Amino acid sequence: MPAPTALRAASDASTTETPIAPHAQEHDEEILIDVQPSNNADDVLASANSAEDTDMRIDLEGRPVFTPAKDTPAAYRVETRKVPVPPHRMTPLKANWPKIYPPLVEHLKLQVRINIKSRAVELRTSKFTTDTGALQKGEDFVKAFTLGFDIDDAIALLRLDDLYIRSFEIRDVKASLNGEHLSRAIGRIAGKDGRTRHAIENASRTRIVIADQKIHILGRFQNINAGQEAVVSLILGAPPGKVYGNLRKVAARMKERF
């Protein structure tokens, strides 16, 4: 019989070790694998929610109806525009500046200044600007004033989205006009004391500016076409009476339409 303090044989130690059951290892591996699908389940749930946000359905008339998009905070980025001012419009711009900058600053939330050295009006967005098209509207407003339109007419570009400015030269209509013939064409468009121009404006619901050999027309797309047709007819030499008759017909059609 060995002493109580004697070392045990190696064979006894090996016989006392209990091997790990393979089933237990497989069970541990299954537990580790099951950890990943829990995260995938969250991803699937998030993708399902995003799919619900962009869900599309068809209404009774067969038109697609989308769920409204959520408002996301847009990144603030400074954008600038420069509107060149002709030399002959610099003095009117300075005189009417107290009436020009309030709509740009208060309505569009833009930063604006006159650069005397470069003879331009500089526009810049601020952190208070919410309309993405504010910079373009401000540029159109200032450009309309530099072309010769009144402030009240130019402000309409800020309030209405369907107004445009179309510009063309008299020689674009008839390239052979020179000297006195060109002067007579300009006189036919303007009329005595501007009566012909006012008649075209009232009939076509537009505003017309005659700047030397250039014609600028402000209004809606269809109205601009009507006004341009009358101006082109006068340039080509049509009698004013015939042009007035055509304008009356156009005005009657517009009245019936609206």
Curated annotation (Swiss-Prot):
Molecular function per GO: rRNA primary transcript binding; unfolded protein binding
Segments for region (Disordered): 1-26
Pfam families assigned: KH_PNO1_2nd (PF22891)
Keyword Hydrolase: no
GO CC annotations, alphabetized: cytoplasm; nucleolus; nucleus
InterPro entries: KH-I_PNO1_first (IPR055212), KH_dom (IPR004087), KH_dom_type_1_sf (IPR036612), KH_PNO1_2nd (IPR055211)
Keywords on record: Cytoplasm, Nucleus, Ribosome biogenesis, RNA-binding
Subcellular localization: Cytoplasm; Nucleus, Nucleolus
Keyword Transmembrane carried by entry: no
Domain KH: start-end pairs: 179-231
Main subcellular location of this protein, as a coarse class: cytoplasm
GO terms of biological process kind: endonucleolytic cleavage in ITS1 to separate SSU-rRNA from 5.8S rRNA and LSU-rRNA from tricistronic rRNA transcript (SSU-rRNA, 5.8S rRNA, LSU-rRNA); endonucleolytic cleavage to generate mature 5'-end of SSU-rRNA from (SSU-rRNA, 5.8S rRNA, LSU-rRNA); proteasome assembly; ribosomal small subunit export from nucleus; ribosome assembly
Function: Required for small ribosomal subunit (SSU) synthesis. Has a role in the processing of early nucleolar and late cytoplasmic pre-RNA species.
PANTHER family noted in UniProt: RIBONUCLEASE Y, RNA-BINDING PROTEIN PNO1
Protein name per Swiss-Prot or TrEMBL: Pre-rRNA-processing protein pno1
Species in which this protein is naturally found: Emericella nidulans (strain FGSC A4 / ATCC 38163 / CBS 112.46 / NRRL 194 / M139) (Aspergillus nidulans)
